[in-house]
Amino acid sequence: VIGGDECNINEHRFLVALYDPDGFLSGGIL
């Protein structure tokens, strides 16, 4: 759903981590 630079690290990092454990990796936390 969320990926790469489009990911707002400030918000989506934890949202995606909760909804999609795999997605948060694409969110840009790492």
UniProtKB/Swiss-Prot annotation:
<keyword id="KW-0325">Glycoprotein</keyword>
<comment type="similarity">
    <text>Belongs to the peptidase S1 family. Snake venom subfamily.</text>
</comment>
<dbReference type="GO" id="GO:0006508">
    <property type="term" value="P:proteolysis"/>
</dbReference>
<keyword id="KW-0800">Toxin</keyword>
<keyword id="KW-0720">Serine protease</keyword>
<keyword id="KW-1015">Disulfide bond</keyword>
<comment type="function">
    <text>Snake venom serine protease that catalyzes the hydrolysis of arginine esters, kallikrein substrates Pro-Phe-Arg-MCA and Z-Phe-Arg-MCA. Cleaves kininogen analogs to release bradykinin. Induces contraction of the isolated rat uterus directly at high concentrations, but provokes more forceful contractions when injected in presence of bovine plasma. Shows capillary permeability-increasing activity and hypotensive activity on the anesthetized rat.</text>
</comment>
<dbReference type="GO" id="GO:0090729">
    <property type="term" value="F:toxin activity"/>
</dbReference>
<keyword id="KW-0964">Secreted</keyword>
<keyword id="KW-0645">Protease</keyword>
<dbReference type="GO" id="GO:0008236">
    <property type="term" value="F:serine-type peptidase activity"/>
</dbReference>
<keyword id="KW-0382">Hypotensive agent</keyword>
<dbReference type="GO" id="GO:0008217">
    <property type="term" value="P:regulation of blood pressure"/>
</dbReference>
<protein>
    <recommendedName>
        <fullName>Snake venom serine protease</fullName>
        <ecNumber>3.4.21.-</ecNumber>
    </recommendedName>
</protein>
<keyword id="KW-0378">Hydrolase</keyword>
<comment type="subunit">
    <text>Monomer.</text>
</comment>
<feature type="domain" description="Peptidase S1">
    <location>
        <begin position="1"/>
        <end position="30"/>
    </location>
</feature>
<dbReference type="GO" id="GO:0005576">
    <property type="term" value="C:extracellular region"/>
</dbReference>
